[in-house]
C-alpha cells in the first residue's frame, strides 16, 4: 500500500519497532524518530544534549507575555453554504456556529501555520500546560485539525518549527515540545491504534460502566473548571490537552464513566478528533482502560498537538 504523507512512520515500520520491545514506551519511539528524521539532532545526539524538555514546559501564565491576536478567515461561499446547512439540519445539537474560525482551504491552513510560528511558538513551550480562566487558546497552535485532515503535512510543520529554532526565533524547549507532539505522540498513538484494532476499541480494564452525565452535552454544571472546558469546547470545537486530559477526562476516570461513552463524546465534539488518535488517548491516557498498553515516561500525560 502507499504510504500516507500525513505521517512520518508507516504502519509496517511501527509494527517492526513494536516487535522489538515488551513495553511500548513512547519516549523510545520518539528518540528513534528523531534519529530517523534528523530533527533537532547533531549526528546521533540531540541538540542541547537532552531529548526531552518537558520539565521546562510547565509555567503558569499570569498575563505576560501578551497573548497573540486570534487569526480569523473570511468565509467563502462554500463555507457559508455549509454553515447554513448545519444550522438548518443540526440546530438542536451541542455547539455553536457563531465563532467558527477554522481554515477550510490549504492556503489558509498555511497562514495558520505561519501565524503560530511567528506569534505563539516562542512561548508555546513555557505555557503549554497552563490553564487560565477565559483564555481559550493561550499559545497553542490550533493546527491539529489541519494535520489530521491533510491540509497541512507534518513534515512541513516540523520543518517550520525547526527553522524557527535555527533562526533564534523560538527557544529549544518550545520547538522540541512542539515537534515531540507531532513526531512522537501523534505517530505513536496512530501506530498503537492500527496495531491493536479492532479488539482495542472494546477494552475496559477497570470495568467502568457509569453513564456519561448529561452536562457533558449541555455544559451546565457548577464545577467551574468543567464549565470552562465545556464553554471552550462548544464555542470552538477545541480544548487543549490539559483541559481534555486533566479536567473532562479526569472527571470521567474518577466517576467510573463507561470508556466507550466518553470516547464517543470526544469523537463528537472536537474538530481534530479522528478515531485513530482519539481512541488511544481516551482508553489509554484518560481512562486507563487499555491494560496499561500505552506507556509514557513523562510525569504529565497529554493529548497531542494542541
Go through the PLM ranges and name each one:
Residues 294-305:
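Single conserved hydrophobic/aromatic residue that forms the stacking wall/gate
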Residues 15-16, 263-266:
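"Short basic amphipathic alpha-helical interaction patches in structured regions
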Residues 1-102:
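Beta-rich, aromatic/charged-enriched effector core domains that present basic-aromatic interfaces
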Residues 57-237, 253-254, 265-289:
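Catalytic cores of enzymes that engage adenine nucleotides and/or redox cofactors via long glycine-rich
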Residues 241-242:
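Generic helix N-cap/helix-start motif at coil->alpha-helix transitions
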Residues 256-260:
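Structural helix-adjacent loops and short alpha-helical linkers that scaffold large soluble proteins
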Residues 248-252:
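Alpha-helical support elements that line or immediately flank enzyme active sites
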Amino acid at each position: 500500500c502507499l504510504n500516507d504523507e500525513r505521517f512520518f512512520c508507516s504502519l509496517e515500520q511501527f509494527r517492526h519497532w513494536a516487535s522489538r520491545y515488551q513495553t511500548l514506551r513512547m519516549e523510545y519511539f520518539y528518540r528513534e524518530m528523531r534519529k530517523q528524521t534528523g530533527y533537532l539532532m547533531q549526528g546521533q545526539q540531540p541538540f542541547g544534549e537532552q531529548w526531552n524538555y518537558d520539565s521546562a514546559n510547565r509555567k503558569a501564565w499570569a498575563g505576560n507575555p501578551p497573548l497573540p491576536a486570534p487569526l480569523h478567515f473570511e468565509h467563502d461561499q462554500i463555507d457559508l453554504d455549509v454553515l447554513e446547512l448545519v444550522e438548518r439540519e443540526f440546530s438542536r445539537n451541542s455547539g455553536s456556529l457563531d465563532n467558527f474560525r477554522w481554515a477550510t482551504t490549504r492556503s489558509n491552513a498555511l497562514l495558520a501555520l505561519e501565524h503560530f510560528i511567528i506569534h505563539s511558538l516562542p512561548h508555546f513551550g513555557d505555557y503549554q500546560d497552563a490553564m487560565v480562566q477565559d483564555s481559550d487558546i493561550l499559545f497553542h497552535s490550533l493546527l491539529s485539525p489541519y494535520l489530521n485532515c491533510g491540509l497541512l503535512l507534518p513534515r512541513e510543520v516540523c520543518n517550520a518549527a525547526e527553522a524557527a529554532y535555527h533562526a533564534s526565533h523560538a527557544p529549544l524547549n518550545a520547538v522540541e515540545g512542539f515537534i515531540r507532539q507531532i513526531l512522537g505522540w501523534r505517530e505513536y498513538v496512530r501506530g498503537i491504534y492500527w496495531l491493536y484494532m479492532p479488539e482495542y476499541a472494546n477494552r475496559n480494564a477497570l470495568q467502568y460502566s457509569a453513564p456519561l452525565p448529561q452536562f457533558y452535552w449541555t455544559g451546565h454544571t457548577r464545577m467551574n473548571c468543567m464549565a470552562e472546558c465545556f464553554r471552550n469546547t462548544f464555542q470552538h470545537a477545541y480544548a487543549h490537552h490539559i483541559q481534555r486530559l486533566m479536567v473532562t477526562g479526569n472527571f470521567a476516570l474518577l466517576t467510573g464513566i463507561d470508556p466507550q461513552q466518553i470516547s464517543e463524546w470526544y469523537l463528537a465534539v472536537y474538530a481534530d478528533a479522528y478515531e485513530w488518535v482519539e481512541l488511544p488517548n481516551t482508553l489509554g491516557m484518560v481512562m486507563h482502560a487499555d491494560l496499561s498498553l500505552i506507556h509514557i515516561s513523562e510525569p504529565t500525560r497529554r493529548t497531542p498537538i494542541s
